[in-house]
Design a protein with these regions (language model features):
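Short helix-capping segments at alpha-helix termini
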Residues: 23-25, 77-79, 183
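Cofactor-binding loop segments of dinucleotide-utilizing enzymes, especially the Rossmann-like FAD-
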Residues: 9, 32-33, 64, 86, ...
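Generic structural signal for conserved hydrophobic packing positions in ordered secondary structure
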Residues: 8, 59, 81, 128-129
Length: 200
């Protein structure tokens, strides 16, 4: 029997649970630090996030916030963490994906791509050939990285955004939904628009 503990009893966590079920996990439980939450999507909440290392189960962090996801994931032994890929994702054979990353339905990841740990590659997004995606990145619903794009750690690419070929987006950035990024973006900024411009 394959058992999975998902940290984060939320809407995102329910999506992760659905992917886990499709990957053959027959027992799914949640961990959450909110003592008022007792179930999520019909699955029981059995404890808090700090208990993840002690549970006899595989573990994945199902939390959208990158800084929280990173803090929790880095407290869990690597050997307990898994990668989840929806069976309807199209994933090239030679890609590299780090532990704790979730790849959702309809996603395309093309040859030569490298994706770090703890990432969310969300529904119907595209990571094209030879892209380098850092740790704890969120590629949101329907966003597209064209070929040879680089995305730094902790960056959030908003829903429906497009990043043009050979562009580098540095760490801890936020790219607004629907933006078109055609130039490099420095660390720790928010960029928005078509073409995207740094707004703070």
């Amino acid at each position: 029997m394959r058992k999975l503990a998902i940290i984060g009893a939320s809407g995102h966590g329910r999506v992760v649970a659905d992917i886990a079920r499709k990957n053959g996990y027959s027992e799914i439980v949640f961990l959450d630090d909110d003592e008022n939450i007792h179930e999520c999507g019909g699955y029981p909440v059995i404890g808090k996030s700090a208990e993840a290392g002690m549970i006899d189960a595989d573990v994945i962090v199902g939390i959208g916030n990158a800084s929280v996801r990173r803090r929790i994931q880095e407290s869990i032994p690597d050997e307990k963490l898994i990668i989840l890929i929806h069976p309807d994702a199209v994933v090239a054979e030679d890609i590299v994906i780090g532990t704790g990353t979730v790849v959702m339905a309809g996603t395309v990841i093309n040859p030569g791509a490298r994706i770090g740990k703890g990432c969310i590659i969300n529904t119907c997004s595209c990571v094209d050939h030879d892209c380098e995606v850092g740790d704890y990145v969120h590629i949101a619903v329907g966003s597209h990285l064209c070929g040879t794009v680089s995305v730094g750690n902790g960056t959030w690419i908003g829903a429906g955004a497009t990043v043009s070929n050979n562009v580098s987006i540095c760490s801890n950035c936020m790219i607004g939904a629907g933006s078109v990024v055609v130039k490099d973006v420095p660390d720790n900024v928010t960029a928005f628009g078509s073409p995207a411009k740094v707004i703070k």
